[in-house]
Amino acid sequence: MNPMKNRQFQIRRMIPEDISEVFRIDAQTAALYWPESSYHFETERNDASRCWVAVNENGSILGFLILWLIVDEIHVANFAVHPEYQNQGIGTALLIHGLINAWEEGARVSFLEVRASNLSAIHIYQKLGYEPVGIRKNYYQDNHEDAIMMNLESEAYTKIYNQQE
């Protein structure tokens, strides 16, 4: 499980100049997407945010990840891969990259909410060791879909960190 090998993209910190492209990806992939102003807040003013993008050799953004580091916990706040680039390991690589960097800043557990119908995201999370721990009924405002709460406990998180090269 190393999507970092032989990849045709780079992962780097998100910068304000990325926001319009990140916003378009979010709008294409999410029924409830963040306004552009939220991305500006996350990249420019939120000290808890850790924002990443995957870019190809032309500099086009393929996906993004926004994490919030709160003491020793990392919360997956927003995460998407452009529809044309899904199922190519980009999402997994982004998440691993973000988790490893957060580990180096002291994170030891991670948590998130995911739509119950988002099977591809659930698959990525479970592959990395996240486990469902509860349901938030009617969590999403657009269709009242449930959110599955998932945690990555310390032991599974340690395994991800130790598998890096």
Roles of regions detected by a PLM:
Residues 4-9, 13-84, 95-97, 101, ...:
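Acetyl-CoA-dependent GNAT
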Residues 76, 110-114:
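Conserved hydrophobic beta-strand within the GNAT/NAT acetyltransferase core sheet
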Residues 82, 86, 115-117, 142:
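Residue-level recognition of the GNAT/N-acetyltransferase active site
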Residues 87-100, 123-127:
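Conserved acetyl-CoA-binding loop-helix of GNAT-fold acetyltransferases
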Residues 95, 118-121, 138-143:
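Short glycine/proline-centered loop/turn elements that form peptide/ligand docking sites
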Residues 113, 131-148:
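Conserved catalytic-core motifs of GNAT/GCN5-like acyltransferases
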Residues 125, 130, 150:
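Conserved active-site tyrosine of GNAT-family acetyltransferases
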